[in-house]
Curated annotation (Swiss-Prot):
InterPro entries: Exonuc_VII_L, Exonuc_VII_lsu_C, OB-fold_nuc-bd_dom
Species of the source: Bacillus licheniformis (strain ATCC 14580 / DSM 13 / JCM 2505 / CCUG 7422 / NBRC 12200 / NCIMB 9375 / NCTC 10341 / NRRL NRS-1264 / Gibson 46)
Main subcellular location of this protein, as a coarse class: cytoplasm
One GO BP: DNA catabolic process
Name this protein carries in UniProt: Exodeoxyribonuclease 7 large subunit
EC number: 3.1.11.6
Length: 449
């Protein structure tokens, strides 16, 4: 009987999990169903069961995926869920790891719309204080829309008709379908990153709520709010507003209306210039007439008829001012003289003879102190000198010689050993009181007795 091969539960579960993970059909899949057993964890994770009439699957959506969720999942909602299927090893059950949840059906879309509208309004994304002004005379207008739809043709035609000087840049964008929101966000970010235009039109032609839903996505709303370029929302829906309409700096009911808001009308500008020119001409003529009348009045005035009298009064005023100046100058000189006399008196009070007497007294006192200090210091130096001299004399060879010792030299070299001399050598013996020249008759060391 052959030996049976066993596997552990863990190994089997891991094997099955790998089968799920490598299956391309289960890696990214859309599933339609009804929510039940919805539980929102304190950390933000959402646990729920997705079911239909015949089956159910355990599901989880982690907090990092549900941050942009446009509505709050509740039991009984019909939804479309995108995610991947894998095995939860501890229980050995397969489950759905959700990445995206969308309401299924128009009623659910309206619910999601209202919840997102409330959320963004509370955050302040709709506040007027954040609205950027639309430039009056843009040089470049950017258009975020489908490059093949009627909307882009209407926008370009309207802009060129109204204001031919402007340049139009179209950023080809998906405006309908699953990836439309991501495409709109990408185009807005590209326009800002490259600083492509002065104003941006974001929109499309009309359609159903499902077709316009991309303009109700939170990511699109936040991209519009974060844009440095002013944005005109142009979703072709006369009565209903999209979330993008609330966030945009300006809302137009149609793409054509957005084009009219984005650029001025050249004909209107020309007409306005003509009106301003006529108004300015009339104003200048009126002003010129007033000035001419004023000149006439001046020419007939008293001053022009008697010009000398015009400055006679001024001459008199000048004389009065000059007299006051001279008086003021004399008073100033007198004050300076008085102050000088006071200073002179103070200097005379400080007699130089007294100052010299005090200086001599201080000099004599300092001289006495200096002599006394010098005597003390000389006495100390003499005492130190005698001490050092005594020490030097104690070490001097002359002092040693006074006690009966002598120094013996051979050819000016001091003899320290009998090995330095030989018999018949001439040596010089220095005593305390003189020098002897001697001849060596005999050498005898200590060993010779």
């Amino acid at each position: 009987m052959s030996e049976i091969s066993f596997v552990t539960v863990t190994a089997l579960t891991k094997y099955i999990k790998r089968k799920f993970d490598v299956d391309p059909h289960l890696e990214d899949i859309w599933i339609k169903g009804e929510l039940s057993n919805v539980k929102i964890h304190s950390r933000g994770h959402i646990y729920f069961t997705l079911k239909d009439d015949n089956a159910r699957i355990q599901s989880v959506m982690f907090a990092r995926q549900n941050r942009n969720l446009a509505f709050t999942p509740e039991n009984g909602m019909k939804v479309l869920v995108r995610g991947g299927i894998s095995v939860y090893e501890p229980s050995g059950s397969y489950q759905l790891y959700a990445k995206e949840i969308q309401p299924d059906g128009i009623g659910a879309l309206h619910l999601a719309y209202e919840e997102l509208k409330k959320k963004l309004s509370q955050e302040g994304l709709f506040d007027e204080k954040y609205k950027k002004p639309i430039p009056a005379f843009p040089s470049v207008v950017g258009v975020v829309t489908s490059p093949t739809g009627a909307a882009v043709r209407d926008v370009i035609t309207t802009i060129k008709r109204r204001y031919p000087l402007v340049k139009v840049i179209v950023l080809p964008t998906l405006v309908q379908g699953v990836n439309a929101g991501e495409s709109i966000v990408s185009s807005i970010e590209e326009a800002n990153r490259r600083d492509l235009c002065d104003v941006l039109i974001v929109g499309r032609g009309g359609g159903s709520i499902e077709e316009l839903w991309a303009f109700n996505e939170e990511a699109v709303a936040r991209a519009i709010f974060s844009s440095d370029i002013p944005i005109i929302s142009a979703v072709g829906h006369e009565t209903d507003f999209t979330i993008s309409d609330f966030v945009a700096d300006l809302r137009a009911a149609t793409p054509t209306g957005a084009a009219e808001l984005a650029v001025p009308n050249m004909l209107d500008l020309l007409e306005r210039l003509k009106t301003l020119e006529a108004r300015m001409t009339k104003s200048m003529q009126q002003d010129l007439k007033k000035r001419q009348e004023r000149v006439k009045n001046l020419q007939s005035s008293y001053a022009f008829r008697y010009p000398k009298r015009l400055y006679a009064q001024k001459e008199q005023e000048f004389d009065l001012i000059f007299d006051r100046f001279q008086k003021q100058l004399a008073m100033t000189v007198d004050r300076k003289k008085q102050k000088l006399n006071e200073q002179t008196y103070k200097l005379e009070m400080l007699h130089p003879e007294e100052q010299l007497k005090q200086a001599r007294k201080r000099h004599e006192e300092q001289t006495v102190r200096l002599k006394r200090n010098m005597k003390v210091q000389l006495k100390q130096i003499h005492s130190q000198f005698q001490t050092v001299l005594g020490k030097l004399n104690a070490l001097s060879p002359l002092q040693v010689m006074e006690r009966g010792y002598s120094l013996t030299y051979k050819e000016n070299e001091l003899i320290k050993s009998i090995e330095q001399v030989h018999e018949k050598d001439e040596i010089r013996v220095t005593l305390n009181d003189g020098t002897l020249t001697c001849e060596v008759l005999q050498k005898r060391g200590e060993t010779n007795g």
